[in-house]
From Swiss-Prot:
Annotated region described as Esterase domain first part, given as residue ranges: 4-121
Protein name: Hemagglutinin-esterase
GO molecular-function term, one example from the UniProt record: host cell surface receptor binding
Species annotation: Human torovirus (HuTV)
Record family assignment: Belongs to the influenza type C/coronaviruses hemagglutinin-esterase family.
């Protein structure tokens, strides 16, 4: 009996933390994933092209890198695979951010990589913020614009592709005007509480070789919302650089107006619809890079920041030992993504395990789930300190110990 009594205190003080599994996991069994060609089981090269377990393919919604970003800006583009589905799950994991194309075909003018990257980062920051607190993500087409007899789509010089959402349209005069767009509160069976709407314009907003250039301004306006840009002294002449400048706005469902002062009218033709959930769950993102022979961007990493997002970074270059090509079937990512086959109790930036006993030094925000932690019972300088568990494990251990002690006294009293 004495050995039994001594066993439980020693158990309580001897247990050590478990090293977390590094990579995305889920807690609720209600998880959706946004991937790319590396998670596309319909490819001819599958499964040799996959970075994820083959039986997890149905949970992935995307088949091309950065397609959520491209889909908000392009309606039709032969070289892009756009997001035409929707997901309605609690936990969200992204592995789709590497693609740089069409970085040099994103504006009529040569804004280069930096401006494109800023837009991609800005979009994903807002997407993460929305996805953390809202449940369903659905891309919907908005109602067609009103008829304008003097309206024509802006056409780029050379072969560059100006994004066609928001639609950039050219007016024959500078009379202030507006076009109405509706963000519906219901799309099919999906309730839409909030929308992620792109608000874009070309800076230096005058495209004329003449001697004058009228002021330029554009805004989205409703009874409860007003956001705009105004350029009172636009540049004159075709030689000036014109960048495609975008903000990404959280807008409630309802009727809104796109108003314009100047020659250009900008109005949205599609938007991401979200509906609500009653709790906050950070999204998770896995670093997506090309092999060392190709250029990769870090927009997803820049956008994945606490408290909205947990980012899992690779520790090695993209390395393929048995894949379809040098950019598909990375060994390290396949190991990381295998965690999606199992559910967990605690998710953190350091990793996760099904039943982890974490030291306080292991965890930093954001975390979610049940994360039992060790704390110091006492700490004397120079002497040995003792760890106990500040969680249900601690309570359960000592409750069991008390029960055993009581049983011992009962047995002793019975024989006495």
């Amino acid at each position: 009996m004495l050995s039994l009594i001594l066993f439980f205190p020693s158990f309580a003080f001897a247990v050590t933390p478990v090293t977390p599994y590094f990579g995305p996991l889920y807690i609720t069994f209600n998880c959706c994933l946004f991937g790319d060609s590396r998670s596309d089981c319909t490819k001819v090269q599958s499964p040799m092209s996959l970075d994820n377990p083959q039986n997890f393919c149905p949970n992935f919604s995307l088949k091309s890198s950065s397609s959520m970003f491209f889909s908000i800006h392009y309606n039709n583009h032969s070289s892009l695979v756009l997001f035409d589905n929707f997901n309605c799950r609690i936990e969200k994991v992204y592995y789709n951010g590497v693609n740089l194309s069409p970085r040099n075909q994103y504006s009529c003018y040569d804004e280069g990589v930096d401006s494109y990257m800023e837009l991609k980062t800005s979009f994903n920051i807002k997407l993460n913020q929305m996805a953390t607190i809202l449940r369903c993500i659905k891309l919907i087409q908005l109602k067609a614009r009103s008829s304008f007899t003097t309206l024509q789509d802006v056409v780029c010089r050379t072969n560059k592709y100006l994004p066609n959402n928001p639609t950039f349209a050219l007016l024959s005069d500078t009379v202030p005007t507006w076009v109405q767009f509706v963000l519906p509160d219901l799309s099919g069976k999906t309730i839409c509480i909030k929308y992620l709407v792109p608000f874009c314009h070309l800076n230096h907003g005058c495209f004329t070789a003449g001697s004058s250039c009228p002021p330029f301004g554009v805004s989205y306006v409703s009874d409860s919302f007003n956001y705009g840009f105004n350029d009172a002294t636009p540049y004159i002449g075709l030689a000036e650089s014109h960048d495609n400048v975008c903000d990404y706005l959280f807008v409630e469902a309802g009727t809104h107006n796109a108003s314009i002062v100047g020659n250009f009218l900008f109005y949205p033709t599609k938007s991401y619809c979200f509906n609500t959930m009653n709790f906050t769950v950070p999204v998770q993102a896995i670093q997506s890079i090309w092999s060392e022979g190709n250029e990769s961007d870090d927009a997803i990493a820049e956008a994945c920041k606490p408290p909205f997002c947990i980012y899992y970074s690779k520790t090695t270059p993209y390395t393929v030992t048995n894949g379809s090509n040098a950019d598909h079937r990375d060994d390290e990512v396949r190991m990381m993504v295998r965690g999606l086959l199992y559910n967990s109790s605690c998710i953190s930036a350091q990793g996760s395990t099904p039943l982890a006993l974490y030291s306080t030094a292991m965890l930093y925000a954001p975390i979610y789930g049940s994360c039992p932690q060790y704390v110091k019972l006492f700490d004397t300088s120079g002497s040995e300190s003792v760890d106990v568990i500040s969680s249900s494990y601690f309570v359960a251990t000592w409750v069991l110990l008390v029960v055993v002690v009581i049983l011992i006294f009962v047995i002793i009293s019975f024989f006495c």
